[in-house]
From Swiss-Prot:
The keyword Ribonucleoprotein does not apply. Belongs to the protein kinase superfamily. Ser/Thr protein kinase family. LRR repeats lie at residues 87-110, 111-135, 137-158, 160-182, 183-206, 208-232, 234-254, 278-302, 303-326, 328-349, 350-372. Residues 667-948 form the Protein kinase domain. Its main location: membrane. It comes from the Eukaryota. The chain crosses the membrane at residues 608-628. It comes from Arabidopsis thaliana. The modification Phosphothreonine is found at residues 656, 827, 832. This is Probable LRR receptor-like serine/threonine-protein kinase At1g53440. Its EC number is 2.7.11.1. Residues 969-1035 are annotated as: Disordered. It catalyses: L-seryl-[protein] + ATP = O-phospho-L-seryl-[protein] + ADP + H(+); L-threonyl-[protein] + ATP = O-phospho-L-threonyl-[protein] + ADP + H(+). GO terms for cellular component: plasma membrane.
């Protein structure tokens, strides 16, 4: 009894103690929430957290994080005001940087008072659980995980949300329209995902937004006009979204903006947006937005708080405003890659801030040496013969001495080292925000761009995570990186062909199961202005982080004395993992070696020395005679026909007529390889052994030599793997010559329609590759290049094939040389019957959709192996295209596939290509897709849903009459082609043993109005063709 008595007293004592501690109003977590929290942490694979009913009071949650490069942050907040302060409820859960694994537990939906979930920088997968729509959530932050799947539509049901922060994940698909229900939303941060499609119109309802970031996604459509509704917006980020311009005028309503970042827009050029009321602006980035205007004066007067200004890679002209002297707060200014003129203001030159003015057209250059300049002015002044201008300031970086180097080895971001027999130069300059450095006479680099959110980030990287294997070359352990643009230059290089090797290894992300492994680095690679890689991902191409990858280019031509390697960030990938400022281009090492035999340096024989002396004497004598003649002392002074070209900044190589005559054996007919609407083409071999193609243009161009050279310079800047490369030009007397790369396999027309001896019998994979190549080339001309070009004459004869049967478009930009005005209504039709879009052929209405139509015809020819203009299966069908529409209605499109292929082709790909061809040849230009979409369709990335054009829904009705008009158009158009042209076409089709000859319909002596007068009443039906065709029923 005594034992039981004492035990009872002990129990009572414990009870009294507990009551004394907690009282009658003990603030405890309900048992159901305790169990819910334990389940959540078990599923998050963190077993160390201690969850008790008393945890809200003693706050002993016992969080333990794995080793990580960033200090983790944890916080669980309770509200204990429920039921007269006797019950606690969890309201906020913050677990940042714990590398939590697994999925986001759906049990979060059982915490009925939870208003915040912050799981930033972990290693979570899966998607957002639907159960979250059951709770009054206000903040959802999951940036820096590996969450995936369609963007969660259930978020649109949580109308209490004020902050949605989901950057740097893997969400896909379009934004759900019901996000417009979140009228309390203040922050919507969804950058660096894989979101596609348009920004939904319903988001116009989000009038409380203060921060909207969607950069680094692959969106479509234009920047919506309704962003002007977001008048409370403080920050707007639209970097690298692939959206179309222009920036809408409604943006002027956003008077509270402090940060505006819009980059890499597609579409037409546009004026500078009206931002003058944004007086609180601190960071303004409008990079590559196709803006063609002077810089507004108000930037210097209204935006006095500006810290960062980036207007690079536009088409800005005029001078730098004097009002910029009032920008006392700025740290970074980027006006590079524009067309600015005039002298650089002295207050800019005296500034010690980061300023990049490279690649402009300034005058009055400074006298400082290249390495004394604090402002990056590389390649910003015309190439002139005045040697007082520093070489680094002049276009194309001409060699200040003899161009004698033939190799280059750089350990980017690392020390000098020797690998095998090669000595790699060190590259340790720590500057990079706006820097040009010519480390030696052999090479230099230019770096540009400020880091997002981390001005102090480094420009040199080391193998922080010890990823590089000891057996891997040492240069992979270091790297140079840049936030935006990184260029390396090989200087004073000999002319000729080189092999370029670029060495990469991702050394800034880890290879473990932590958030530090989740970074994605994407950038573009150009060599000599030619795009080699778009959205290049080092880790992906190498098969993991810390693994080496070599990108090699076997033939790179140096025609001047400079070789340029350009790595460029376009706003894609992540920029917060493992810390802010880890993104942008990165490279470990560069090697450049010659493809030609290099002089060994052995001493010259006496005979060779004597020959050199004699040759020098002869040359000097000739020079004296030339000077005497030009000054009038010998035969009088003659006017130099090309005097107006002196001092011009030629953006392309210059050839002499003597060089070209020697190369082509004086334009020997045996070397003639083709003839088109712009003149004959000859094969030639230069003295250094390089094979070229020379196009002999008509000398009747309406433009003067200066304008001609300007246009050619602009065309030569258009460089893409699927465009024929323009090496240069020659203008002497009446000769206008263009020098192109030589393509060994001639034209696509010859490969498909030539004689049995000439045809290449292309297999299906090659046809598919050729079709995609043409589409990529046109997409570049229309949407990606700075100079937007409509080709006007896309056809099989204007597509050439190299040794590997890669397609390259020729004659791009040449129709522009005969233009007098730049308007949508072209009075001079340049094209070929059977390939011209109806609105262009009949009305002269010219847009890039005319090229889309022509591409559709060529695509049809590639699949069928038949010429659109020569193949008529039945008398009532005018073109192959006409027959294709019939087969489409009958469901028999595959009958068009070239019988030579037999069964060796993909039916799925063939149907895809044929449907795309019909989609592109839609009579209505507005229903034809842009070429970038065509590329995606051909690659199977997006579905093809071509509209069906009904020909014979009512054989006696209007539809049949509309297609009958197409026959009248063909007959009328053929009557307009000169007898000479028809004779040439007849010759090309009947005699295929010689060079492939083709003619375009381009008659400069007759404009549209004259042609219409000559037609008279007999062709009234075809003049109404456009009106007829646009009424064709579309399903």
């Amino acid at each position: 009894m005594g034992f039981f008595f004492s035990t009872r007293k002990g129990l009572l004592l414990i009870i009294f103690i507990c009551l004394d501690i907690f009282g009658s109003n003990a603030q405890l977590l309900p048992e159901d929430e305790v169990q819910t929290l334990r389940t959540i942490f078990r599923k998050l694979q963190n077993q160390t957290v201690n969850i008790e009913r008393t945890s809200c009071l003693d706050r002993k949650w016992n969080f333990v994080a794995e080793s990580t490069s960033k200090l983790p942050t944890s916080n669980i907040t309770c509200d204990c005001t429920f039921n007269a302060s006797s019950v606690c409820r969890v309201t906020n859960i913050q677990l940042r940087g714990f590398n939590l694994r697994g999925i986001i537990p759906p049990e979060f939906g059982n915490l009925t008072r939870l208003t915040e979930i912050d799981l930033v920088l972990n290693f979570l997968s899966g998607t957002i659980p639907t159960t979250l729509s059951q709770i009054p959530l206000e903040i959802l932050a999951v940036t820096g995980n590996r969450l995936s799947g369609p963007f969660p539509p259930q978020l649109g049901q949580i109308t209490t949300l004020t902050d949605v922060i989901m950057e740097s994940n893997l969400f896909t698909g379009q934004l759900p329209p019901n996000l417009g229900n979140l009228r309390s939303l203040k922050r919507l941060l969804i950058s660096s995902n894989n979101i596609t499609g348009r920004i939904p119109e319903s988001l116009s309802n989000l009038k409380n937004l203060t921060n909207f970031r969607i950069d680094g996604n692959s969106l479509s459509g234009k920047i919506p006009d309704f962003i002007g509704n977001w008048t409370r917006l403080v920050r707007l980020d639209l970097q690298g979204t692939s959206m179309e311009g222009p920036i809408p005028a409604s943006i002027s309503n956003l008077k509270n903006l402090t940060e505006l970042r819009i980059t890499d827009l597609r579409g037409p050029t546009s004026p500078f947006p009206d931002l003058q009321n944004m007086t609180n602006m601190e960071r303004l980035v409008l990079r590559n937005c196709l803006i063609r205007e002077p810089i507004p004066e108000y930037i210097g007067t209204s935006m006095t708080m500006l810290k960062l200004l980036d207007l690079s890679s536009n088409m800005l002209n005029g001078t730098i405003p004097d009002t910029f002297r009032s920008l006392n707060a700025f740290n970074f200014m980027y006006l590079n890659n524009n067309s600015l003129t005039g002298p650089v203001p002295q207050f800019i030159l005296d500034s010690k801030q980061n300023i990049d003015l490279s690649y402009n057209n300034f005058t009055q250059p400074p006298t400082l040496s290249c390495n004394q300049l604090d402002v990056n002015l590389i390649s910003s002044y015309p190439s002139v013969t005045n040697n007082s201008v520093q070489w680094c300031l002049r276009k194309d970086l001409p060699c200040p001495g003899d161009a004698h180097h033939s190799s280059l080895f750089i350990n980017c971001g690392g020390n000098r080292l020797k690998v095998d027999k090669d000595e790699y130069a060190d590259d340790l300059n720590k500057r990079g925000a706006s820097t040009f450095s010519s480390v030696s006479e052999r090479w230099g680099y230019s770096s540009s761009g400020a880091w997002l959110g981390n001005d102090g980030a480094t420009y040199l990287a080391t193998d922080t995570f010890n990823l590089i294997n000891e057996s891997t070359p040492e240069y992979y352990k270091t790297a140079r990186l840049a936030s935006q643009s990184l260029k390396y230059y090989g200087l004073c290089m000999r002319r000729g062909s080189y092999k370029v090797q670029l060495y990469f290894a991702e050394i800034m992300f880890s290879n473990d199961q932590t958030y530090s492994s989740l970074g994605r680095r994407l950038f573009d690679i150009y060599v000599q202005g030619i795009l080699l890689e778009r959205d290049f991902n080092i880790a992906q191409r190498a098969g993991g982080v810390g693994k080496p990858f070599l990108r090699q280019v076997d033939e790179v031509q140096v025609n001047g004395s400079t070789l340029e390697i350009h790595l460029k960030w376009t706003g894609k990938g992540t920029n917060v993992i493992p810390t802010r400022g880890v993104y942008g281009p990165l490279i470990s090492a560069i090697t450049v070696t010659p493809n030609f035999k290099v002089d060994t340096g052995k001493p010259l024989s006496n005979g060779v020395v004597a020959g050199i002396v004699i040759a020098a004497c002869v040359a000097f004598g000739l020079l004296v005679l030339v000077i005497l003649r030009l000054t009038g002392y010998l035969g009088g002074k003659e006017v130099d026909e090309n005097e107006e070209l002196r001092g011009l900044d030629l953006q392309t190589g210059s050839f002499t007529l003597k060089q070209i005559k020697r190369a082509t054996n004086n334009f020997d007919p045996e070397n003639k390889i083709g003839e088109g609407g712009f003149g004959p083409v000859y094969k030639g071999v230069l003295a250094d052994g390089m094979t070229i193609a020379v196009k002999q243009l008509s000398s009747k161009s309406k433009q003067g030599n200066r304008e001609f050279v300007t246009e050619i310079g602009m065309i030569s800047a258009l460089q893409h793997p699927n465009l024929v490369k323009l090496y240069g030009c020659c203008i002497e007397g009446k000769e206008l010559l263009l020098v192109y790369e030589y393509l060994e396999n001639n034209s696509l027309a010859r490969a498909l329609f030539g004689t049995e001896k000439q045809r290449l019998h292309l297999d299906w994979s090659t046809r598919n590759k050729v079709c995609i190549g043409i589409a990529k080339g046109l997409a570049y001309l229309h949407e990606e290049s700075r100079l937007k070009i409509v080709h006007r004459d896309i056809k099989a004869t204007n597509v050439l094939l190299d040794l590997s049967l890669n397609a390259k478009i020729s004659d791009f930009g040449l129709a522009k040389l005969d233009e007098e005005e730049n308007t949508h209504i072209s009075t001079r039709i340049a094209g070929t019957i059977g390939y011209m879009a109806p609105e262009y052929a009949m009305r002269g209405y010219l847009t890039d959709k005319a090229d889309v139509y022509s591409f559709g015809v060529v695509c049809l020819e590639i699949v069928s192996g038949k010429s659109n203009t020569n193949y008529r299966p039945k008398e009532e069908f005018i073109y192959l295209l006409d027959w294709a529409y019939v087969l489409q209605e009958q469901g028999s499109l595959l009958e068009l596939v070239d019988p030579d292929l037999g069964t060796s082709f993909s039916k799925k790909e063939a149907m895809r290509m044929l449907n795309i061809a019909l989609l592109c040849t839609n009579p209505s230009p507005t229903l034809r897709p842009p070429m970038s979409s065509v590329v995606s369709m051909l690659q199977g990335k997006i579905k093809v849903q071509p509209p069906l054009v009904k020909r014979e829904a009512d054989p006696s009705g209007s539809a049949a009459m509309r297609f009958k008009a197409l026959e009248h158009l063909s007959q009328d158009s053929e009557s307009q082609v000169s007898t000479y042209t028809r004779n040439k076409e007849h010759k090309s089709s009947s005699s295929m043993d010689g060079p492939w000859v083709d003619s375009s319909f381009s008659d400069p002596s007759k404009d549209v109005s004259l042609l219409q007068q000559e037609e008279g009443n007999s062709s009234s039906s075809s003049r109404r063709l456009l009106d007829d065709l646009t009424d064709v029923e579309i399903e």
